[in-house]
From Swiss-Prot:
Gene: RBM12
Species per Swiss-Prot/TrEMBL record: Homo sapiens
UniProt region (Disordered), positions on chain: 96-116, 392-424, 717-853
Keyword Calcium attributed: no
Lineage: Eukaryota, Metazoa, Chordata, Craniata, Vertebrata
Transmembrane segments: none
Name used for this protein in its record: RNA-binding protein 12
Length: 932
């Protein structure tokens, strides 16, 4: 069913093809566009289907030839009435127009000329003009070009004073509708032709200084003045008519087909603008339909681009071109994220602004399975997104080609394009500031990151700190604005496994930053290095730096400087650690001028910094560099802290672990000369000669010391505890047990200077052999064993041992590395196992019966299941945790239970950790600490 739409606001220069182009993609049948004109610039469009009409109504508010149009629903009846009304208005206006030379001397026009009845006379003369008349009128026109009554040769035998009526386009437009009835009306009397001699008196007009022979005189005073002889003389403005624009001048040309006596009908509506119902001369129409008569406006480059949002991630360039089917797409650029995947946005470039305008009408339409948004874009966005501009011949509004725009060079000198830009600090330049560069980044990596962009030679600057390592900052300068904008679009893209931040910066700002970095390097002079030299001349061993942890993630340099108020610190010496995403790690590094200032900072340990207790640890310059190079998630992972009282022992690696320094002699069976006990004494005392199976020694420590039984694969934080192969012979004893005389040294507190717990009073040799079998619990362990004295042997088979000592596999290969062997077997200054520099502590959980407290175990509960050993060490950072003692618990299925065991060097240290850190979070869960 055909639907009619009424269009208002149509400009004068628009034609039917412009309307059809406005409704491109919709079905308009042939002859379905009717332009009425009028004051509102109206037109009627007939659509073939309701759907086309509905889609057409959605385009209301659009522009045709720069004029905004409004669409209204209409009907065929209204359309026909408006067309008929327009025709009548044209006819009435044409017949009421007075002749242009009505005020000239001569016989007045006949009163019948204002009526339609005199038209047949003139129309009949159109088809059979007299050659003499045509020649005469033409010659008159040649001599009087300013007189519009002789502006056409098609007047026939009509009097000259009627030329204005016949020569106007409005009059000619009524000929097709009036010629048919005119032939039936008898011609009225016509004024005689001899009235023509009334024209010669015109040259005698006194106000005109032109000599009389010149025929180009202006009209008489009542007629408005005419400009001096143009190529096509314009008509005198006519009285205003309702809704009619100014008329075009009459053509001056030979008679067209249809007027030369051939009798062929004249089709005035053929390829003409219907707003005027056909111009006067079909050969030279009013050239409004031809774009060649209208000078094309310069095209704004921004009018060629649109931005598309919300596309499916799987959309390709062909999908975008299919979406804009029917439009001339020049190029498509799909935007991508930092990984290189489509992000659902894109930019499209068209060949003409009309295509862009039509593309904007497809906003909120379906592409594949998603409704996309189409919005205007600019050439700057296109260039910034990485699109290329090719200055080829651009298409004008109607398809004409225009030469490319003239691009002026930056410099008038011949080499201006080849040399780099001036390095004046006052010049803005095209510079970028890079942050987050890998520490091993070089110029070639930066060039590869900005590949295909024109970088100024030797303009890449990578900043280095006082330690000689890259700080992650850099600067790059580009040659032109397009490459500069393209570089800014690579913000947060990856270089290797780190994403780079690209920020704009002026050349002056870049030079200031580079100068600041160089001054920082100069301040780190050799004099300052000498200040922190220790007596041995080691630069890195002096503790002139502080590592501040457990601070808010949003901490800033100013907060740290306020926290260190009273201690002289340079602002450039404070470094807040951030991760790869630029987020704070809750840590800061401070480098002081001397060790005294660093010691002063230790007084701030556990002081409040923005609501949190800050942990301040003094570290060496080497440690600070290590922390700065590999910033941990929290604290410094793997930072080895010196443990008081646990020095490295020659021949015993890993600070107290039994090693190759343990002799193979002195075992039962080989005799114990140092104790004076025969080798058979141990067997007679109740020790099994075939060894002690692991099941024979109960684990009195229970689950609390179960970490001693886990394998090194599960602990994964310490070396396996293996006795030397020659220690136990051919596995004759399995896990070796120290001789009875050494019991106090082996199972009591074996620290240097601590006497044994034997009854004889001799250090290390006070245990009687008979008392070993049935003594009054004189070998019972300390209270830390499991809540009370234990029998260390009331007969064969009941020999007790330290908790967990015998629960491991033979050789104690899985025990933590801090569990030492008998002290008498290691080197020492004296012959006995008494005081000496060897520190072989007992297993964690051992408490001493006297003197310094021994290692203590803490049970950590309610941790996240994904927690790692490093995170636990970070949690206890600052406390003296025994290296390699952290053990995660797993259930029978191998799944984590959220619990762990941690051993500390002393009970005081463990107690402080429980008091300070209980109910503190690890991740999103608050952990519980239970003292062993």
């Amino acid at each position: 069913m055909a639907v009619v739409i009424r269009l208002q606001g149509l400009p004068i220069v628009a034609g039917t093809m412009d309307i059809r182009h406005f409704f491109s993609g919709l079905t308009i049948p042939d002859g379905g566009v009717h332009i009425v004109g009028g004051e509102l610039g109206e037109a009627f469009i007939v659509f073939a289907t309701d759907e086309d009409a509905r889609l057409g109504m959605m385009r209301t508010g659009g522009t045709i030839k720069g004029s905004k149009v409004t669409l209204l629903l209409s009907s065929k009846t209204e359309m026909q009435n408006m067309i008929e009304l327009s025709r009548r208005r044209f006819e009435t206006a044409n017949l009421d127009i007075p002749p242009a030379n009505a005020s000239r001397s001569g016989p007045p026009p006949s009163s019948g000329m204002s009526s339609r009845v005199n038209l047949p006379t003139t129309v009949s003369n159109f088809n059979n003009p007299s050659p003499s008349v045509v020649t005469a009128t033409t010659s008159v026109h040649e001599s009087n070009k300013n007189i519009q009554t002789f502006s056409t040769a098609s007047v026939g035998t009509a009097p000259p004073n009627m030329g204005a009526s016949f020569g106007s386009p409005t009059f000619s437009s009524t000929v097709p509708s009036t010629a048919s009835p005119m032939n039936t009306v008898p011609p009225p009397p016509i004024p005689p032709i001899p009235a023509m001699p009334s024209l010669p008196p015109m040259p005698s007009i006194p106000p005109i200084p032109v000599p009389p022979p010149v025929p180009t005189l202006p009209p008489v005073p009542p007629v408005p003045p005419i400009p001096p002889v143009p190529s096509v003389p314009p008509m005198t403005p006519l009285p205003p008519m309702s809704g009619m624009p100014p008329l075009n001048p009459p053509p001056v040309a030979p008679l067209p087909a249809g007027m030369n006596g051939s009798g062929a009908p004249m089709n005035l509506n053929n390829n003409l603008n219907p707003m005027f119902l056909g111009p006067l001369n079909p050969v030279n129409p009013i050239q409004m339909n031809s774009q060649s008569s209208v000078k094309p406006l310069p095209i704004n480059p921004d009018d060629l681009y649109v931005s598309v949002h919300g596309m499916p991630f799987s959309a390709m360039e062909n999908d975008v071109r299919d979406f804009f089917h029917g439009l001339r797409v020049d190029a498509v650029h799909l935007l991508k994220d930092h990984v290189g995947r489509n992000n659902g946005n894109g930019l499209v470039k068209f060949l003409s602004p009309q295509d862009t305008f039509e593309a904007l009408k497809r906003n909120r339409m379906l592409m594949i399975q998603r409704y996309v948004e189409v919005s205007p874009a600019t050439e700057r966005q296109w260039v910034a997104a990485g699109g290329h501009i090719t200055f080829k011949q651009n298409m004008g509004p109607s398809g004409q080609t225009h030469p490319p725009p003239q691009t002026l060079p930056r410099s008038k000198s011949p080499s201006g394009q080849k040399r780099s830009r001036s390095r004046s600090p006052h010049e803005a330049g095209f510079c970028v500031y890079l942050k987050g560069l890998p520490f091993e980044a070089e110029n070639k990596h930066v060039i590869d990151f900005f590949k295909k962009l024109d970088i100024v030679e030797d303009s890449i600057y990578i900043a280095y700190g006082p330690n000689g390592k890259a700080t992650g900052e850099g600067f790059v300068e580009f040659r032109n604005e397009a490459d500069y904008k393209a570089a800014l679009c690579r913000h947060k893209q990856y270089m290797g496994n780190r994403f780079i931040q690209v920020h704009p910066i002026t050349k002056k700002g870049m030079l200031e930053k580079i100068d600041m970095i160089r001054k920082r390097l100069q301040n780190f002079s050799y004099d300052q290095r000498e200040m922190i030299l220790n007596p041995e001349g080691d630069v890195n061993s002096a503790k002139v730096c502080a590592h501040i942890t457990n601070i808010p993630f949003s901490i800033t340099k100013m907060d740290v400087l306020q926290f260190l108020e009273g201690i002289p610190v340079d602002e450039n010496a404070v470094h807040v650690l951030v991760d790869n995403n630029g987020q704070g790690l809750g840590q800061a590094l401070v480098q002081f001028k001397n060790e005294d200032d660093a010691r002063k900072s230790e007084r701030l340990h556990r002081k409040k910094l923005n609501g949190r207790e800050a942990f301040v640890h003094v570290v060496t310059l080497e440690d600070m560099r290590e922390i700065e190079k590999n910033p941990p998630a929290q604290g410094k992972k793997g930072l080895k802290m010196p443990v008081p009282g646990n020095p490295a022992v020659p021949g015993m690696p890993n600070a107290g672990l039994p090693g190759v320094g343990l002799p193979s002699a002195g075992l039962p069976g080989a005799g114990l000369p140092s104790t004076g006990l025969p080798g058979s004494a141990i067997t007679s005392a109740g020790l099994p000669g075939a060894g002690m199976p692991s099941a024979g020694i109960p684990s009195a420590g229970g689950e609390e010391h179960a970490f001693l039984t886990v394998g090194s694969k599960e602990a994964n934080n310490g070396p396996p505890f293996n006795f030397p192969g020659n220690f136990g012979g051919s596995n004759a004893f399995g896990p070796p047990i120290p001789p009875p005389g050494l019991g106090g040294g082996a199972f009591g507190d074996a620290r240097p200077g601590m006497p044994s717990v034997g009854n004889s009073g001799l250090p290390g040799l006070g245990l009687d052999v008979p008392g070993f079998g049935g003594g009054p619990n004189n070998l019972s362990g300390p209270s830390g064993f499991g809540g009370g004295p234990q029998n260390f042997g009331n007969g064969p088979g009941s020999l007790g041992g330290p908790p967990g000592f015998g629960s491991g596999p033979p050789g104690l290969g899985s025990a933590p590395g801090h569990l030492g062997g008998p002290p008498a077997f290691g080197p020492g200054p004296g012959p006995g196992p008494g005081p000496g520099p060897i520190h072989i502590g007992g297993p964690p959980g051992f408490a001493s019966s006297s003197g310094k407290p021994g290692p203590t175990v803490i049970k950590v509960q309610n941790m996240p299941f994904t927690v790692s050993i490093d995170e636990i060490l970070d949690f206890f950072y600052g406390y003296q945790v025994i290296p390699g003692s952290v053990c995660l618990k797993y259930n029978e299925k191998g799944m984590p239970t959220g619990e762990a065991m941690v051993a500390f060097e002393s009970r005081d240290e463990a107690t402080a950790a429980v008091i300070d850190l209980n109910d503190r979070p690890i991740g999103s869960r608050k952990v519980k600490l239970v003292l062993g």
